[in-house]
Amino acid sequence: MHHQHGEKHHHCVATRRGVVALLAAAAGVHSAMGLRYALAQGAAQGGAQGVAAGPDEWMIDTHHHIYPPRYTRENLKRIVDDSSALPAAAYTSWAPGWAIEQMDKAHVRAAIVSMTSPGIWWNNGDQAREWARECNEFGAAMAKEFPGRFGMFAAIPLPDPEGSMREIAYALDTLKLDGIGLLTSYAGKPLGHSAFASVLDELNRRKAAVFVHPTMSCCGMEIPGISPPAIDFSTDTTRTIASLAFSGTFARCPDIRFIFSHGGGTMPMIVQRVAGQTRNFKPEELARILPNGFTAELKRQYYDIASVALNPGGMAAVLKLVPVSQLFYGSDAPFGTTTAVAGALAAFELPPADIRAIRRDNALRLFPRFAA
């Protein structure tokens, strides 16, 4: 038993070294042969050639996080402070080979990966631009090394409009990534804030898929024994959805395909309470910001079922709010297991076609390149 543990540790170290080589290759300072060799162990053990699954079983995972090594190493204190209640090994030992192993366990054909909280923005635009570029090139190199297994929602320094515009162009036009990943708020500003309008207008022009993941809000409070993300993540998602709706951003940017994490936070449970806030607006204002009504805007957005699928009451609220066509499978790896959400989804009494839609068909409408 001890010997097997040692073998596993050796594999993780070797694969992790491979990721460092991957970053170097992505930056153009390492040979292609070095990149292939570095990730060979992850490919061999992770089954990079494909997933054996029944015709209705394989899935697309749209909520799957990565931890590029230099980013993780140099920002470890920030990551720990943000995620202190989560197992440190999830980010300190993360490697592409491990990710593929987890994907194969749940018949996940492809994962569209993203950065997670705390993200790349710490009130330093130049630093954020550097981290966005490095993380995005890491994801692009990983996708190239494991064809068909990975996509990416690119990181951008959202509070820096000029830097964001440059990184959007590079990520989508040069790296050919699958969309953009945003956090729910930056320095206390939700996504509907006017400071972000120009960047969202550009994403609307590009008809971009935009994955939105929660972060710690500016106004949480500590409860002894309770990890702040357990409550505040869902709340910040709800807050940013409301801000996008009531700022008129949803109406102004109808071509952005927003994907909100964890079934939209607490919004499905309090939707009528939030919808009641329309009484605070004049009719002419509502006609501009919510021409189709509040709930109509929510119904056309997309939501992944990470975490919420493990809560039958929460999942029931999601299914009551939005049609099945708007739901994606998401594992929340490496913090959630790929198999937990898959098992919970299979246990719901939904028609087989609906299960298949959530597993992959809905995602394939937005990301058809993963159909092959």
Please place each PLM-identified region on the residue numbering.
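Mid-to-C-terminal alpha-helical segments outside catalytic/metal-binding sites
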Residues: H2-L39, A48-W58, T62, P68-A110, ...
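Hydrophobic faces of well-ordered beta-strands that scaffold small-molecule active sites
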Residues: I60-H64, A111-V113, M152-A154, I180-L182, ...
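Catalytic metal-binding/acid-base residues of hydrolase active sites
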Residues: H65, T215-M216, G264, A309, ...
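Active-site gating loops and adjacent loop-to-helix segments of metal-dependent hydrolytic enzymes
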Residues: P68-W94, S217-T237, V274-Q301
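Acidic-and-aromatic substrate-binding clefts and catalytic sites of carbohydrate-active enzymes
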Residues: A89-S93, I120-W121, L158-S164, A187-S194, ...
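Active-site gating/metal-coordination segments in enzymes
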Residues: R109, V113-S247
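Active-site-adjacent C-terminal substructures of enzyme catalytic domains
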Residues: S234-D236, D255, N280-T338
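Active-site region of glycoside hydrolase catalytic domains
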Residues: F246-R257
